[in-house]
Amino acid sequence: SYRALIIAGPSEKGQELAEIVNSGKELTWDELDSANWGVMSSSSPAGYVYPSLWLQDKYGKGLTDLSSAVQSDSYASALARLASGQVDCILAYADVRRDYEDKWESEFGAKNSIWEDTNVIGVTDPIYNDTVCVSKNSKNMNDDLKAAIQKALINIGNTDEGKEVISIYSHKGYQEAQSSDYDKERDAQKLIKELSK
């Protein structure tokens, strides 16, 4: 799993929001709504869906309720807009700053490092990107087979050879999950259905 971040940039408004959070206070909806936002496509888990759920959980509002939100076609363009002050906040996957650290100053024109210029002002629930699932409807599936598959996959991820095999998926290993671990994913799927109406 990974998380999405709500990242405030170097603009005056971005720094104002970061200062509030860094002082230990909660941001209000009006404070968030006063910013210019950079969002990704409505199908993006980290750049739209999970941050929208975060807003719903905290404020009872969604991204569509923001007064000023522009869609970016890539995380690079979102960060370029953030660096230039065109937007005050962006929504992105947790490692985005590390992935674009070199480009922040060299290509996006920022004056300081990405770590000096940006602040995390929100963190979403975990996003479960990849899963191994079994069918509840299969006549061949039973608890013993389910446990054996689970154990085998976890064991594969615990060996050097297995890690090499699963690295093609950028996986580092597997762990047991419960149905309740995916409650937020169910909420995300509901939101996606609503957005596509």
What does each of the following model-derived ranges do?
Residues W54-D57, A83-S84, D88-W115:
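A ligand-binding cleft/hinge motif common to bilobed small-molecule-binding domains
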Residues N36-P45, S68-A69, K136-K139, H171-E176:
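Second-shell loop/turn segments in exported
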Residues G9-K13, S42, A94-V96, P126, ...:
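Solvent-exposed coil/turn segments that connect beta secondary-structure elements
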Residues G62-A80:
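Short helix-initiation/N-cap motifs at beta->coil->alpha
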Residues S1-L5, F108-K146, Q150, S167-E176:
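Periplasmic-binding protein-like
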Residues N140-K197:
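An extracytoplasmic/periplasmic, membrane-proximal ligand-sensing/linker region
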Residues L32, L82-A83:
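Hydrophobic residues within well-ordered alpha-helices
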Residues S1-A46, P51-Q56:
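A conserved helix-loop-strand patch within extracytoplasmic ligand-binding domains
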